[in-house]
């Protein structure tokens, strides 16, 4: 029995299946962890959702910002952007079934035995694990309820950007959503910066990657995350695993086998697509 952690798939279905064949993933025996952003940008978002849903208890995933945006498009709140390549999914006969399943997925995965935590963007250093679990449940409860469109309409925005237990209502839910799905840089006190997207070396002072600021969760648990493709899986402290390596941008899809910390990669088909386009 093995545990495989895979970074942001972003609709790259063919690469996902090739990578799972490479590692000899066996549903029912092995467990697959996915860092979120299953959809958008790649050509196979519909196939990705159908496949991941079919895995049942053999998969543990978290929602990413692109997954939430898809739900907002589905609810009629946000615009379907052509670059996201979501139309086949939105027009599929099983779209309702797939997206109602998707909105019931968690923001946080925890394995106490492995001392492993996974969230799409990471864990803000302002939270301990108890707070992170409570915050994840708050958003998950709204997403799985009939009032989820109201939340999705209000989730967009960069404020508030500083955690306080006193946060209430939509501001609290927006901060939680941003921390779990959009976070990259923080100020030294842990306050979120929602504007900078460059590499850590190019970020303006005093910003630091969230994982460079000591926090209580990282002291006791390993943390796996995606979201930040420009890291290229590098530059994180021991016990922090950056798994998004930009498959949808022509990079690779990365898998970490947890038991021996061995990495597997599958090159993006985007190189092939671009080459064929240039030759045609």
UniProtKB/Swiss-Prot annotation:
It catalyses: P(1),P(4)-bis(5'-adenosyl) tetraphosphate + H2O = 2 ADP + 2 H(+). The keyword Hydrolase applies. Keywords: Hydrolase. Pfam families: Metallophos. The keyword Hydrolase applies. Its EC number is 3.6.1.41. GO terms for molecular function: bis(5'-nucleosyl)-tetraphosphatase (symmetrical) activity. InterPro entries: ApaH, Calcineurin-like_PHP_ApaH, Metallo-depent_PP-like. It comes from the Bacteria. Belongs to the Ap4A hydrolase family. PANTHER family: CYTOCHROME C5, PTHR40942. Hydrolyzes diadenosine 5',5'''-P1,P4-tetraphosphate to yield ADP. This is Bis(5'-nucleosyl)-tetraphosphatase, symmetrical. The gene is apaH.
